[in-house]
Design a protein with these regions (language model features):
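Phosphate-ester processing/binding pockets and catalytic centers
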Residues: 1-241
Length: 241
């Protein structure tokens, strides 16, 4: 689960920039969203895209994150984390029930846990900048709830809305989609390049993504050489403490 923190004062400008790039995307590729997995694999609407254009799209979103200083919060749930942090997870599950997340499967439970922990991590971060800061609203890709559904979470004694929407209708979500893709792609590039030289496209991708490493606020991400990618080594205990 990946979330992005955008200052309320920047929302309108960010929307204008995203809509401009989305209109270009529609004109060039007849696509409504930036699907970076498809872009890099030359699939679906992006079947005919060349490497330069693919890198340009990655650069666009990296520059958006830098320009608006968008902070990125990540949360992954694993069986080991659940075993080691039973009390924490029990508390998170209680919050999930208060939010109305009636999860049937374990996967749905973990999705709601990741969402709530992400929100709590985001709250902790914005309050660390200034005691006056707060989470104004949360927008989440449809999954736990259908498009246009909403619920609330209590933060600091206040009810904060969680609105569920599609990334096609709510373009801000595409920034979070990109941030999630960037993290996954970095790990994949690392795995593929063990003991061998990274391919040119992957190396250029890593060089672009290296610039947004500091924006991931709750992982320790260090790149001493773009050719070797990003090393993520902060533990779950460090993230939640």
């Amino acid at each position: 689960m990946v979330g992005c923190l955008v200052p309320a004062s920047e929302i309108e400008q960010l929307a204008g920039k995203l809509n401009f790039h989305l209109s270009e995307l529609k004109e060039l590729y007849d696509a409504d969203e930036y699907h970076f997995t498809d872009i890099c694999n030359h699939k679906n609407q992006f079947e005919g895209i060349d490497g330069f254009d693919a890198l340009s799209m990655i650069q666009i979103f990296a520059e958006i994150i830098k320009e608006y200083d968008i902070k990125i919060v990540t949360q992954t749930i694993t069986s080991e984390m659940l075993e080691k942090n039973g009390d924490l997870i029990a508390g998170v599950d209680a919050i999930a029930r208060e939010c109305g997340f009636s999860s049937i499967s374990e996967a749905q439970k973990n999705e709601s846990r990741a969402l709530i922990l992400n929100i709590l991590n985001a709250k902790k971060y914005v309050e660390s900048l200034s005691g006056d800061n707060e989470i104004a609203a949360v927008f989440c890709d449809e999954g736990l709830r259908k498009n246009n559904a909403e619920t609330k979470i209590k933060l600091g004694g206040k009810d904060v809305e969680i609105d569920f929407c599609s990334s096609k209708e709510f373009p801000y979500l595409q920034v979070a989609d990109f941030a999630a893709w960037a993290l996954t792609r970095s790990k994949l590039n690392l795995e593929k390049s063990q003991n061998k030289e990274m391919k040119d496209f992957d190396l250029m991708t890593m060089k672009i993504l290296e610039d947004i490493v500091p924006n991931y606020i709750n992982i320790e991400a260090v790149s001493t050489n773009a050719g070797y990618g990003i090393n993520i080594d902060k533990t779950f205990d460090e993230i939640i403490k």
